[in-house]
């Protein structure tokens, strides 16, 4: 869900569940056992507002970061060349609570929509999810992050 490695492996992006904020932490600090919690925390950056609530994150080899946005049935992209600006990659009423993202070698971004808001816990005991669940894809002409 809300975790993605940067294209060069130097930053790990994350967001709290259903958060509107994006954060990153230095990966070198995460693997350095000599650092205490405060030293690791000192490498955390607030990357700003994600343009909406959601917790699915992904990144591509070009350095772009993708985030789900359940409020607008959408996936957003923070382009590496626009210094933090977010744009809509896809918005579709069928993307009911987009959740997990994956950039694939075929140039597509794959998206699951889990219909979380339709679960019985949120609908007075009535499960309103529609099955079978759907895996969506949209062409982004990007490649996945490959670190080794």
Per-region residue spans from a language model:
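Beta-propeller domains
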Residues: 1-29
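Beta-rich, blade/repeat-based domains predominating
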Residues: 1-11, 46-64, 93-106
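Conserved beta-strand positions in repeat-built beta-propeller and related beta-rich domains
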Residues: 6-7, 12-17, 59-60, 65-70, ...
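Structural signal for beta-propeller blades
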Residues: 20-22, 73-75, 118-119, 135
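Short loop/turn segments immediately following beta-strands, especially the blade-tip
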Residues: 24-37, 79-82, 140-144
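A short beta-strand motif characteristic of beta-propeller blades
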Residues: 39-49, 86-90
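Beta-propeller domains with acidic blade repeats across secreted/periplasmic ectodomains
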Residues: 71, 85-96, 102-103, 114-116, ...
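Blade-level signature of beta-propeller repeat domains, shared across WD40, Kelch, NHL, RCC1
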Residues: 102-148
């Amino acid at each position: 869900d809300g975790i993605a490695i940067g294209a060069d492996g130097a930053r790990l992006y994350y967001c709290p569940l259903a958060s509107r904020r994006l954060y990153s932490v230095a990966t070198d600090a995460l693997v350095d056992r000599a650092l205490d919690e405060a030293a690791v925390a000192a490498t955390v950056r607030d990357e700003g507002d994600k343009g909406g609530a959601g917790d699915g994150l992904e990144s591509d080899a070009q350095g772009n970061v993708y985030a789900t946005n359940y409020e607008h049935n959408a996936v957003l992209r923070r382009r590496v060349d626009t210094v933090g600006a977010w744009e809509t990659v896809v918005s579709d009423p069928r993307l009911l609570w987009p959740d997990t993202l994956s950039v694939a070698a075929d140039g597509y971004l794959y998206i699951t929509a889990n219909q979380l808001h339709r679960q019985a816990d949120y609908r007075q005991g009535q499960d309103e999810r529609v099955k079978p669940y759907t895996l969506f894809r949209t062409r982004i002409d990007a490649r996945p992050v490959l670190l080794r």
